[in-house]
């Protein structure tokens, strides 16, 4: 039996994807990172394709749950939900922009991954739209505000903007006013 667990292989593959893209998610490379043999990999995965499928599923499940949890934790208080979502992005503790970016990079070369990203993006935008409805916006206005917020944040990371957490936190009230229309 392999002394390394399935989660360790998945986490190592996740880090490899972030650092090297899909080319880094090769069985030999992962085994070397872990100081294991190829055989250790096959205790848990049929092949590389299964590992990649599970990585994509892990991203889709965990990243969507982070957004949905904001709604459940703040009981339809839109401004609290907005700030919780902003903190989720700014803190970069639970939400990992590098992980998100690695999946988006992969989606540029895989139609299957692109479709999963599209579904996740729609779910995330739906959560943001719900937040804006809780603030008091309806219909297209709630949707557009949600899209602007989401596209802004995804673009922030895609552009590689470099600001300290304190710089980002200092801007939160201004973004809040611009995006929610509230102080």
Q: What residue spans do the PLM features occupy?
A:
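Helix-turn-helix
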Residues: 8, 12-54
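Amphipathic alpha-helical packing segments from all-alpha helical-bundle domains
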Residues: 64, 95-101, 109-136, 140, ...
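Short helix-capping/turn signature of helix-turn-helix
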Residues: 45, 91, 103-109
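N-terminal intrinsically disordered/low-complexity leader segments
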Residues: 1-4, 183
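Hydrophobic/aromatic-rich alpha-helical bundle segments in the mid-to-C-terminal region
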Residues: 114, 118, 133-183
């Amino acid at each position: 039996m392999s002394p390394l667990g399935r989660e360790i292989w998945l986490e190592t593959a996740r880090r490899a994807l972030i650092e090297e893209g899909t080319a880094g998610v090769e069985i030999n490379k992962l085994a070397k990172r872990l100081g294991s043999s190829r055989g250790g990999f096959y205790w848990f995965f049929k092949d590389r394709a299964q590992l990649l499928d599970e990585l994509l599923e892990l991203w889709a499940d965990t990243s969507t749950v982070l957004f949905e949890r904001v709604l459940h934790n703040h009981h339809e208080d839109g401004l609290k939900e907005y700030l919780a979502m902003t903190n989720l992005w700014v803190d970069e503790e639970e939400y990992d922009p590098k992980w998100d970016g690695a999946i988006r990079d992969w989606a540029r070369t895989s139609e299957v991954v692109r479709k999963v990203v599209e579904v996740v993006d729609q779910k995330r935008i739906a959560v943001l739209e719900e937040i804006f409805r809780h603030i008091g916006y309806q219909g297209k206005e709630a949707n557009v505000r949600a899209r602007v917020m989401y596209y802004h944040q995804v673009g922030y990371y895609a552009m590689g903007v470099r600001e300290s957490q304190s710089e980002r936190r200092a801007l939160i009230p201004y973004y809040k006013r611009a995006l929610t229309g509230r102080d």
